[in-house]
Amino acid sequence: MTARKPGWLRVNVPGGARYQQVRDTVKGLALHTVCEEAHCPNVAECWGGGTATVMLMGDVCTRGCRFCNVKTDAHPPPLDPDEPRHLAEAIAELGLDYIVVTSVDRDDLPDGGAGHFADAIRRLKDIPQLLVEVLTPDFRGDAEAVRTVGRARPDVFANNLETVRRLTPVVRDLKAGYDQTLAVLARMKREFPRIVTKSSIMVGLGETEDELLEAMGDLRAAGVEILTLGQYLRPSAWHLPVVEYVKPEKFAAWREAGLGLGFRYVASGPLVRSSYRAAELFLRGELASRPPGP
């Protein structure tokens, strides 16, 4: 039985001049955005503020996670080699100073798309004053693919744990893995310590309080610095049902628990998503204070 959606999950209707500008630019340059593909509830806030989370490598994923609304196919279309250049042109046209770049999983490619991702990062880093956050696939845990992305020097590297250990085989595609995600995050922080690491967990899927706190602790042990916690919202009747709509006060308590574990920043709330822009100002200050290095 699916829980009934409460009033605190209401969102603003998208609109406004800045929202329309971002929408028109995204459409005109044929960009794929998570905001649209995943039906993100924060599209009004982010696009209205001139921020978008864009997707690389097309809009068809080789994995079929049971919480995600992105299209899936074992054999998606080939990569567009001009996509990284087009992406950088679009971001320059939008005039942003912070961009989140994510992608579908591409298990059909030898490097999982790591080289394509790195090309996009380097082009984006050529835009003055632009900070680049990437939310990448796990590349099946391949160390060299992770290094390829790290060498491109994104400012923030994110890979999402998504849920607690017990629920991972139910919630995520079987090609993903709880320990695989932790290993990718740990490798990035170990080999590229100046890159800020980030991860996200959804709640309301049937996890217990102890399981959630354990997952948060596992992320800290992997060196993750930024954590986002948000309510799972069912995209369609074909996806996993919501077991619980968590009250805002519990999110507030988890934020304090996360800070107590040592996370540098925790965004925790019903409508928070992994690419949520609430951490943007914190990250800008954090990155500016870090000394140069690998």
UniProtKB/Swiss-Prot annotation:
The keyword Metal-binding applies. Keywords: 4Fe-4S, Cytoplasm, Iron, Iron-sulfur, Metal-binding, S-adenosyl-L-methionine, Transferase. One of its GO terms (molecular function) is metal ion binding. One of its GO terms (cellular component) is cytoplasm. It holds the Pfam family Radical_SAM. InterPro entries: Aldolase_TIM, Elp3/MiaA/NifB-like_rSAM, LIAS_N, Lipoyl_synth, rSAM. It is found in: Cytoplasm. Residues 46-264 form the Radical SAM core domain. Transmembrane segments: none annotated. Pathway: Protein modification; protein lipoylation via endogenous pathway; protein N(6)-(lipoyl)lysine from octanoyl-[acyl-carrier-protein]: step 2/2. Its EC number is 2.8.1.8. Binds 2 [4Fe-4S] clusters per subunit. One cluster is coordinated with 3 cysteines and an exchangeable S-adenosyl-L-methionine. It catalyses: [[Fe-S] cluster scaffold protein carrying a second [4Fe-4S](2+) cluster] + N(6)-octanoyl-L-lysyl-[protein] + 2 oxidized [2Fe-2S]-[ferredoxin] + 2 S-adenosyl-L-methionine + 4 H(+) = [[Fe-S] cluster scaffold protein] + N(6)-[(R)-dihydrolipoyl]-L-lysyl-[protein] + 4 Fe(3+) + 2 hydrogen sulfide + 2 5'-deoxyadenosine + 2 L-methionine + 2 reduced [2Fe-2S]-[ferredoxin]. [4Fe-4S] cluster 1 binds at residues 35, 40, 46, 275. [4Fe-4S] cluster 2 binds at residues 61, 65, 68. PROSITE patterns: RADICAL_SAM. The keyword Endoplasmic reticulum does not apply. Its cofactor is [4Fe-4S] cluster. It comes from the Bacteria. Belongs to the radical SAM superfamily. Lipoyl synthase family. This is Lipoyl synthase. It comes from Anaeromyxobacter sp. (strain Fw109-5). The lineage of its organism: Bacteria, Pseudomonadati, Myxococcota, Myxococcia, Myxococcales.
